[in-house]
Amino acid sequence: MADLSPVLQPHREGGSRYGYTMFPGLECESEAELSLSLARTKTRSYGSTASVAAPLSERYIEHRLSPSDTLQGIALKYGVTMEQIKRANKLFSTDCIFLRKSLNIPVISKKGSLFNGLGSLDSPENETQDNCNSPTKEPALAEAHTVSIPSSAKTNQPIVRSDEELSAKDFLQRLDLQIKRSTQAAQRLKEEDLRHDDSYATCSYQH
C-alpha cells in the first residue's frame, strides 16, 4: 500500500518541520539588522556625480554665467579642464550650464603646486589681488634690509638700522669696550708693579 502522507518540506534552521518559525522574535531581529546594515552602506556614484573630497590646496571661485559663456571658454579663462568644472558642479553635459546662474571653478593654490608639480591656476581676479598686496610687502622688506646711514651733525637725525643690525653692532661695540678696558687695567697693574719694584730697589739701595 502506497504511503499517502504529504511530503514535508525540510525545516529551516530555528524552525519546525511544518514550515513555520518556532522563534519569530529572532527572525524579526535578523531583518532589523539587515535593514540597518543596508542603510549604513553608501551608494556608489560614478562619473561627474561622484562626490570627490577636495584636497586642502583646492578652493573654489564663483563665476557668474552670462548668455555668451561656454564651458570651454570658462575652462580656458581659469586654466582648468572641463572635467574639473563638471565634477565640481556635478554637471552631466555642457548644456546644463544654462540652467545655473553661477559655476564653482576649482582653483589649485600655490601650496599644492609644490607637491603635485602643477602650476598655480589662479584666476585673473586673484592676480589683481596679489598685485595690489605686493606694494605693501615691498616696503616691509625694504625696512628689514635698510642700510645704516650716519646721522648728520646739522639735522641730528637718528641712525636708521634694522633690529638685527642694531643688536649685532651693540654686541660688538660692548665686546670691544670690555676688551679695551681689560687691556688698560692689565697695563695699569703692570705699570704699578714696575713702579713698586723700582721704588723697592731704590729704597734698598739707599739703605
From Swiss-Prot:
Q: Where is this region: Disordered?
A: 186-207
Show the InterPro entries listed in the entry: LYSM1-4, LysM_dom, LysM_dom_sf
Q: Which Pfam families match?
A: LysM
Domain LysM: start-end pairs: 61-105
Ranges of biased composition (kind: Basic and acidic residues): 188-199
Indicate what this protein is called per its UniProt record: LysM and putative peptidoglycan-binding domain-containing protein 2
> What is the native source organism of this protein?
Xenopus tropicalis (Western clawed frog)
